[in-house]
Amino acid sequence: MTTTIIGFPRIGEHRELKFITEKYFRNEIPQEELLEAAKDLRAKHWNIVKEAGITEIPSNDFSHYDNVLDAAVLFNIIPKAVQDLELTDLEKYFALARGYQGEKGDVRARPMKKWFNTNYHYIVPAIEKDTEIKLAGHKIFDEFQEAKNLGITTRPVLIGPFTLLQLTDFEEGLTATNFADSLVAAYGQVFEKLAELGAEKIQLDEPSLVKDLTAEEKALFLRIYQTLLADKKGLQVLIQTYFGDVRDIYTELTSLPVDAIGLDFVEGKETAALVATGFPADKTLYAGIVNGKNIWRNNYEKSLAVLDAIPAENVVITTSCSLLHVPFTTANEEFEPAILNHFAFAVEKLSELRDLDAIRNGQGEVALTANKELFALERVGRDAALADRLAGLTDTDYTRLPVFAERESIQREKLNLPLLPTTTIGSFPQTKEVRSTRLAFRKGNISEEEYDAFVKTQTDEWIAWQEEVDFDVLVHGEFERNDMVEYFGENLSGYLFSKNGWVQSYGMRGVKPPIIWGDVTRLNPITVKWSSYAQSRTNKPVKGMLTGPVTILNWSFPREDISIKESTLQIALAIKEEVLDLEAAGIKIIQIDEAALREKLPLRRSDWYSEYLDWAIPAFRLVHSTVAPDTQIHTHMCYSEFTDIIPAIDNMDADVISFEASRSNLVILDELKAKNFQTQVGPGVYDIHSPRVPAVDEIAHTIQAILAKVPKEKVWINPDCGLKTRGESETKASLIHLTQAAKAARKEL
């Protein structure tokens, strides 16, 4: 046996890539300095993997922003509006991801979507009628050569052609089949060039194979690979899958003339059963046995049992997916050893792979014994009172009365808001001063009184500014919060927090997911203090801002000893207490964000309700089911594809929902109309994940497009997400344009 990984974290042990890239974005360093720093980081990572004893090391898993974007640029899948910009190649690359607004033009960023069922986001490629697919880039070759110069012959990694086409937007009238042949030809050129450079093997990632496949999609996949594999240019080809099993195409996949196939034995419910039916003797099986998405130690006995049952003769032990989705290393953490021993971040998972390989070769008895002893321990006790509360829940606990239509009338009279009410999603820019002051308080360098005075000043300034700009429903800005999940987790039992557990979410944006260690209950009121203070500074309604139970669960590293359903319901009871406290404090509009609702939705439609929505939607309803009819409940959802779960979202029984719509050209509105969506809606009228400032006319045009699909009585005007990561000047300029556009639209009603 040998060992490998599908991919390694890119941003660095201390987020080096983030900080150097942001310097480049601020024009503080030239392009050459950014590229050199990235080169140094890649070398460091390759050497870490090599020194850990991993026998096959990937390359081209690094990205300056996103690996799907990298593939699009490699094959010249670049919209004409960006191609025509007189910018460097790197500037065009970032323009696709972030938009561009300057002397040389004004283009919007490409849409972002969730990467399958993770909190990573990819930039959606776009193929237009004039797109000429060809080999245009050189990143994959440069990085292979870099590693080779270090004495490391790597296995280059590239998004496979089928998945790349599946993730691409096509101009009207075009389909993937129109471009399959030209894309296959370009991949063939990649094979040829890599072979010339001395590569022995290439990894083509095809995670789209774990989804439901139509007959047409299967035919396209087979057409692509039968052509591509007809001339491999001397390379060995590994088709790598992850995030599930390949039940729809296992027979056809294993019949292809590939050299190796990577299968997920962690999330792939049927992978073991599929392999048990037989695996070709002339192929190598890359067995994804170490969880690439969670941070708990691998149970060696269980993994060895799975490996022992595999009938394949040639097996490589690997991770279930790229290690992009876990933090870098536990070496920088400060947990007690009794806690830390239960965790394995990316670097530690390399050791787990090596241990499993050694044990299989009869050389890892010490490691196996230590692992058995770890799993023999009772890690954490259970909360009996909490278990009783959960057991006592009935249908009425998940039902809010009166029904939506009656509440809508009551709230309209009570709140007395104008048509097209304006609001924001919750957070305002967290400047360097905000972050440094919070850090000083956490370190004990300033007193609680000093910190509170600072937060009050920030809140006062932004409440006053919102009144000045004439927003209808205000927010307090969340200056006291570091992260929308961690802030709540710090006030809940059962949570642990890493010091340096950063994971890439999109571009240079990192998140630090907390760890659910035990049973979850609320320790004390969390948000009432600052929501009440903000409300005392204005006569306009100020939204209470909460993170919903499903999102808290999905943006944490969950337990593996109980179901995620049970953990989510525990969190729901805790957040319910907070909702009722806010209501008692006089907060009349309470937003319960479910930004990550879709994230753990199974990739196969047949599992959507039974495995997820049947408990995730009730968990949200449990949180707000007992508030008064005149308390308005909002929710917010981030970048995801919602069009196919519209009825489930309506069934959340919120009064208002806001969501991303601007980057995706408001396509969700047609589905809302078709499904007779009842909840009031705030489709984001501009994209906050790009630094460009939308013009008033641009926002006005978006508002008119919304009003063409949604009754004016049900429309709210807001950005598409929180503003914490944006600059203050661009934020204020954009929001002023938003309110101006909304007022202009009202006059036309």
Swiss-Prot record:
Recorded metabolic or biological pathway in which this protein acts:
Amino-acid biosynthesis; L-methionine biosynthesis via de novo pathway; L-methionine from L-homocysteine (MetE route): step 1/1
Q: Which residues bind L-methionine?
A: I425, G426, S427, E478, D593
One GO BP on record is: methionine biosynthetic process
- In this chain, Zn(2+) is annotated as bound at H636, C638, E660, C721
Q: Which residues form the active site?
A: H689 (proton donor)
What UniProt keywords are attached to this protein's entry?
Amino-acid biosynthesis, Metal-binding, Methionine biosynthesis, Methyltransferase, Repeat, Transferase, Zinc
InterPro entries under this entry? Cbl-indep_Met_Synth_N (IPR013215), Cobalamin-indep_Met_synthase (IPR006276), Met_Synth_C/arc (IPR002629), UROD/MetE-like_sf (IPR038071)
Entry EC no(s): 2.1.1.14
Q: Which cofactor does it need?
A: Zn(2+)
Source species of the chain: Streptococcus suis (strain 05ZYH33)
Family according to the record: Belongs to the vitamin-B12 independent methionine synthase family.
- Binding of L-homocysteine occurs at I425, G426, S427, E478, D593
Keyword tRNA-binding tagged = no
Protein name as annotated? 5-methyltetrahydropteroyltriglutamate--homocysteine methyltransferase
